[in-house]
Amino acid sequence: MTRAFNFSAGPATLPESVLRQAQAEMLDWHGSGASIVEMSHRGAEFMSVAAEAEADLRRLLDIPDDYAVLFLSGGATTQQALIPLNFAAPGQRADYVVSGHWGKTAVKQAGVYVDVNIAASSEANGYRELPARADWQLSRDAAYVHITANETIHGVEFRDVPDTGNVPLIADFSSSIASEPLDVRRYGVIYAGAQKNLGPVGVAVMIIRRDLLERSGQPRADIFDYRSHVARDSMLNTPPTWNWYLAGLVFKWMLAEGGVTEFAKRNAAKAALVYGAIDGSGGFYRNEVAYAARSRMNIPFFLPDAELDARFVAEAKAAGLLALKGHKVVGGIRASLYNAMPLAGAEALVAFMADFQQRHG
């Protein structure tokens, strides 16, 4: 069997070696006579899987001990709703910087519970660049400042950590976590849906500075309270064990491959290839994002018209290049180059782009 190159924005491609290991262990995990899917989350077998996954993630991202790590059901959108509940008191304001679709979604979720101040937004220019830090209008008494580190739809990425002073910085890292070294201490909270760089859909990773857990936040049930999840080691309720297990395999794979420093090099090389093909096409392919804000993970681009966009997607699929259709919000084409996408995938895409332009340009 020849695997295609899957450029999906998420659920995204996973390392083949991880999939094969999961396949081999599916019916009999480590000689136990049962699948990990069937095991109790409170049994010794899965407890060891959970502990190893957390230890490996801490090693991978160099997470200090004064930060708690959670593996929770659901994805980043769920956390967008829970963050204001946990970290902003009733009547307290929270600052949001909107650099794309998912930042705007975070504002909508938070607005149900807190007074949201949109400190800055690049919506007026179509999210083609990041809001300039000098233009941010931060509140004096904000509970926190929220950013989306990488916008998958519009293809913009924060390459530097914004300085928010004594106000905790909370960041949605769903689509760029573990893609390069990360200074965790610059953030109060980091959260990420796993389905792009960390594993399959269905589990979210939270990295929370422990002192922030002392905030009273809003009245909420235990299941919505991060303190309760920390106290129970992410097992307040039955967790998504299969997803957690697979994420753990991905962590081990990343560590064995050289860790985030190595993936930063690989991701830069892949992105340079694709952007080079776009910029060198004489306008046949267009990326409209300001150069300094270009995402390494998600590269949107457009052909001269929608008919060519559709033809590109169809012919690419026939050539073994999958999921290149752009998000419905913006259209066009989108190539997602997460950690598990090999350099050969970017090379195959660039070769196809050149061939397609020669035939249709």
From Swiss-Prot:
Amino-acid biosynthesis in keyword set: yes
EC numbers: 2.6.1.52
Catalytic activity line of the entry: O-phospho-L-serine + 2-oxoglutarate = 3-phosphooxypyruvate + L-glutamate; 4-(phosphooxy)-L-threonine + 2-oxoglutarate = (R)-3-hydroxy-2-oxo-4-phosphooxybutanoate + L-glutamate
Cell compartment(s), UniProt: Cytoplasm
Binding-site list for L-glutamate: R42
N6-(pyridoxal phosphate)lysine PTM sites in chain numbering: K196
Family under the similarity heading: Belongs to the class-V pyridoxal-phosphate-dependent aminotransferase family. SerC subfamily.
Protein name: Phosphoserine aminotransferase
Originating organism: Stenotrophomonas maltophilia (strain K279a)
Organism placement in taxonomy: Bacteria, Pseudomonadati, Pseudomonadota, Gammaproteobacteria, Lysobacterales
